[in-house]
Amino acid sequence: GGAETGNKEYWAKWEINQYTVTVKPENGKADIIITQDYGTPITAPTLTREGYTFKGWDKEIPETMPADNITVKAQWEINQYTIAFDTNGGSEITPITQDYGTKITAPDKPTRKGYTFKGWDKEIPETMPADNITVKAQWEINQYTIAFDTNGGSEITPITQDYGTKITAPDKPTRKGYTFKGWDKEIPETMPAD
């Protein structure tokens, strides 16, 4: 019998490997797993985190899938926000600017002559929200009383009215045998705050 002679060629068969990029978002959400063929383009995920600005990755995400599994972590910077105080005619209060999520110490109440502070139009949060906010003071006008000591003359009813309102002077008191010469101090045109 004849021996077979001749060359045989063998071709290698390849299957492309898949690798994984594990993205740790560091925002309280689950890891993002990107598994794909070696050499294929990688699209980095877009991440958000309330109160923070995304600053990039702890190491570069390659443009195409490498021949290794890799893990990257998101890098975040905390944002600052401001609470402004519209005191609505009251004493000035400096705005509070601080990091998101930090404890807020409410300022002292504003003051306003002739008024009582009744609070803010919305609650001051316990921790800094992820937004700038403005709160507005709410006021109630005070009432004051002017009393008259007629020093032996006819009685005059005290005047009680809101701060800043126009005062109508009372009729002069009378006293038998005397002529009224006026009050020891001038009656103001508008109700004072004291």
PLM regions and their residue ranges:
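Secondary-structure capping and domain/repeat boundary segments
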Residues: 1-194
